[in-house]
Amino acid sequence: MSFRSIVRDVRDSIGSLSRRSFDFKLSSLNKEGGKSRGSVQDSHEEQLVVTIQETPWANLPPELLRDVIKRLEESESVWPARRHVVACASVCRSWRDMCKEIVQSPELSGKITFPVSLKQPGPRDATMQCFIKRDKSNLTYHLYLCLSPALLVENGKFLLSAKRIRRTTYTEYVISMHADTISRSSNTYIGKIRSNFLGTKFIIYDTQPAYNSNIARAVQPVGLSRRFYSKRVSPKVPSGSYKIAQVSYELNVLGTRGPRRMHCAMNSIPASSLAEGGTVPGQPDIIVPRSILDESFRSITSSSSRKITYDYSNDFSSARFSDILGPLSEDQEVVLEEGKERNSPPLVLKNKPPRWHEQLQCWCLNFRGRVTVASVKNFQLIAANQPQPQPQPQPQPQPLTQPQPSGQTDGPDKIILQFGKVGKDMFTMDFRYPLSAFQAFAICLSSFDTKLACE
């Protein structure tokens, strides 16, 4: 039996995962009465206990299973063929564990495979090339992964969607993993971005904290999951209230026409992540559905006898994680909500200033062919606070270096995120480490919003 026939047989034995519904039950609800819920699609809810019939493929020897998954990972490297890797991860627990062991994160592999990849940092040595399609009639935005080098393409791997909601005093963009269901009440909701009245400041919210970081470990009590526990929980603040970044646009007090100036304070990413050997702490292992988060918050608040704090503020005043989680020891590296870290400041991004072209009489940036239409929305972000380089020994003579795979050189002006227009309602978005696809998409959404005093 050929390798492809094995994969086809496995896929057929479990059905088409994108169209098949599974009955499931939440283990946390079984303790309170075993209430049943409806059905779900796709593989977004890894926390769900899925009841499927055991197949002979579940009893494969680990050595054979490892060889099968490795060969599949190497052969199916791009979408849409990469859906076979996702299908194999959904066969059973042993297959899923093997896929998690072999399939690397986007930071190492440069590939987006599972939904959790959307919240993990991008590749270090290349850029992840995506494009955004805007629908003005429905006020929606869809993010796709580029499958070809062509700029104006209609096909791509869908990643995220967003919907603009205009309020009296602010604008909100709801971000979802579903192309059509864009709602905060959906299990595919993963975050949002909210602006102030002038459209000069934006706050990016995530649905779940960085529970793998020292924040969660510092306050985790015995008997409660570190994934959902916090020392003080506000039942008035739903999931999606974790502030992970703030985007600010400078006011144009002179009123002259010119490029925008923006800064992004990435509160969940320390500046040390750009140093040699640096990492982004608190990377998620899974994306927790909203229903599980809400249920966990309700169970914690009802059973805990600790003091509960209520936060009714929706403004841009600073609030610290230490106010929510209590005092922390000095040796713990904890990212504060206001954008400070005990041992390392947060990563701050700023737009690369364009140069004035005398012949064209316009401001120009080198997008290396990825942007073709002039627009005030176009920008390139670089690190504003580069870490100090470590002293290095005397270098030995080396041959000529090869060009970077991303087409960009390392150094102080290394572009971390670039966004620009290529056609009507079509924009490119290229990002790299340490930003994730979710963070990059949220930052780009802020550029779409109306700026009353920035240009």
UniProtKB/Swiss-Prot annotation:
Where is coiled-coil annotated? Answer: none
Q: Where is the F-box domain?
A: 54-112
- Pfam families on file: F-box-like (PF12937), Tub (PF01167)
Q: Where is this region: Disordered?
A: 386-414
Q: Where is the composition biased (Pro residues)?
A: 388-402
Which GO biological process categories is it annotated with?
regulation of DNA-templated transcription
SUPFAM superfamilies recorded: F-box domain, Tubby C-terminal domain-like
Gene Ontology cellular component terms for the protein in this record: plasma membrane
MF terms (GO), sorted A to Z: transcription cis-regulatory region binding
**Which tissues does the record link to its expression?**
Ubiquitous.
Among CDD domains, the record links this protein to: F-box_AtTLP-like (cd22153)
Q: Which family does it belong to?
A: Belongs to the TUB family.
What protein name does the entry list?
Answer: Tubby-like F-box protein 1
Its organism's taxonomic lineage begins at:
Eukaryota, Viridiplantae, Streptophyta, Embryophyta, Tracheophyta
